[in-house]
A protein has these predicted regions:
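A detector for small-residue-rich transmembrane helices and their helix-helix packing motifs
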Residues: 1-213
Length: 213
């Protein structure tokens, strides 16, 4: 399948399901990430929550980020590796969220953020010189990626919305590990970026260990 069409289908499916969630509160509640329900055996929520969003702004940000970063990943690795990294990042995000909030039975979250963060990390690893245009200003993509995760630390500490900030970190870890797994030459080709992108992950791990998240 044409890679661009492949991406458009993924975005379209996410948009359709998200809008269904906007309009149908029962549907939204049934498929969102919810600790109590997952611990009762509804593990499908760890995947379906990645197709739901809090509002149009949340959906638009994730889909635009995916649209801009995904071509680097499927362009370098192909459609199947792109899908592997996307869903591995989504699942890693859900697993980390479940681990950190396992005793909070009422904790809930939604969003493709974990999967998208994994794709962002993957794209930066594959193309360290990648730049994005933010408010008409070109900035290095790795600064965007690190800033995105640092913002996630704030969101995890604030806990004032329904967005899966914890999933951002799990997604970053998934994207990082699976990109190296499918393209291990990157360890030698882009060693500096491989090291740089561990910084926010290490910060989060230390804060979690100290009980600050």
């Amino acid at each position: 399948m044409n890679p661009a069409l492949f991406l458009i289908i993924l975005i379209a499916v996410t948009v359709i399901i998200s809008f269904k969630g906007f309009e149908d509160s029962y549907f939204f509640s049934k498929y969102q990430f919810h600790i109590g329900s997952i611990r009762k055996g509804e593990h499908i929520r760890m995947i379906t929550s990645g197709f739901l969003h809090a509002d149009i702004a949340h959906l638009a940000f994730n889909m635009l980020s995916l649209y801009f970063f995904a071509p680097v990943v499927y362009g370098e690795l192909g459609n199947y590796s792109f899908l592997l990294i996307y869903f591995a990042s989504l699942i890693f995000g859900s697993m980390l969220t479940l681990y950190l909030h396992k005793n909070d039975y009422y904790y809930s979250a939604i969003g493709a953020s974990g999967a998208v963060t994994g794709i962002i990390y993957s794209a930066i690893l594959l193309d360290p010189n990648l730049q994005i245009i933010l408010f008409f200003i070109p900035i290095p993509a790795h600064l965007f990626g690190i800033g995105y995760l640092l913002y996630s630390i704030y969101g995890m500490k604030a806990k004032n919305d329904n967005i899966g900030h914890t999933a951002h970190f799990g997604g970053a870890i998934g994207g990082y590990l699976f990109t190296i797994l499918v393209h291990h030459q990157i360890l030698l080709e882009n060693t500096f970026m491989v090291v740089v992108l561990t910084i926010p992950i290490v910060i989060m791990a230390v804060m979690a260990k100290q009980g600050k998240l």
